Amino acid sequence: MSGNVKLELRNLTTLYKSGDGVRNINLTVNKGELVTLLGPSGCGKTTILRTIGGFIPATSGQILIDGKDITHLQPEKRPTAMVFQSYNLWPHMTVYENMAFGLKLRKVPKNEQKRRITEMLELVKMTGYEKKYPGQMSGGQQQRIAIGRSLLLQPDVLLLDEPFSALDAKIRSQMREELRKIQTDLGITVVFVTHDQEEAMALSDRIVVMNKGTFEQVGTPQEIYNHPVSRYVADFIGEMNFIPMLDGSTKAVRPENISVSHGTGKDLDGYVRTIMMLGHYIEMTVDTDIGIVKLYITAEEAEQYKKGDPVTLTLGDYRTYSDHQSAAE
């Protein structure tokens, strides 16, 4: 194991009685890295996270943290802490009591408890909420407390299971920014689970795109977005047009990599179908012989077109897929 590796999964298999689960998973997470497991419901991402945390037993394989095998340790014996979507705060305890709970179990002296909790409340921007109960706070505030409580345990690896999915869009975006700042400032190693590609792209050092219990691609957000290795990844991440070719292959091109001009030409001809303002950019769809193609244009460009106009589309950067599993530039 490299000296920079904090967490390693070696041929990890976790199966349920139904036979579903994940098989032969191999992954390394470096110290201070935030790695996101991204995929649709049922792909196995939460199974992996809960297996790392010890909440689901591994069928075979190994989980190592700092080179030490923790595969068969109970959750409370592992150097990990987990934050759930449902917050898991004790409703009958105040914020302070919730945050002190784990420290008491670890027999941390009271003075040290108070010091750590005061510092953590400041870090998660919840100073002054010590005497409030969970039911008196918003979802975002409760999640701040849940994250702070986990960080108080000073875990080697922090596990986050879709922690922001119950929050509205604006609060979710704010919480993402705050988590990333805390993670970077403290140098914490994090494994994050989400089905939200925007969340994964915004937060992650690396993303693991999952499909039916396997890894489709592991890479930086830029690598995943710009160089998807399979049609599945290309379709799952961001917007993508799939254009069938005469030789049976498919061209995949993102809306921002298509340009439009008036009239007909040698590329892809069609007629303007819709022009929609989506904030700082305009989405245009064009009816062509091979189906509807989506592209993004500026507001200034949009003023030059109207529904029904004949146009020609020029494809910029694209990838060619010969089947569902491979791609070529």
Regions found by a protein language model. Name each.
Residues 46-49, 145:
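ABC ATPase nucleotide-binding domain helices that frame the ATP-binding cleft
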Residues 53:
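Helix-to-loop junction immediately C-terminal to a conserved catalytic motif
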Residues 61-69:
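Conserved ABC transporter NBD signature motif
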Residues 38-40:
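The feature captures the beta-strand-to-loop junction immediately N-terminal to the Walker
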Residues 250-329:
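Non-catalytic connector elements of ABC transporters
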Residues 34, 73-229:
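ABC ATPase nucleotide-binding domains
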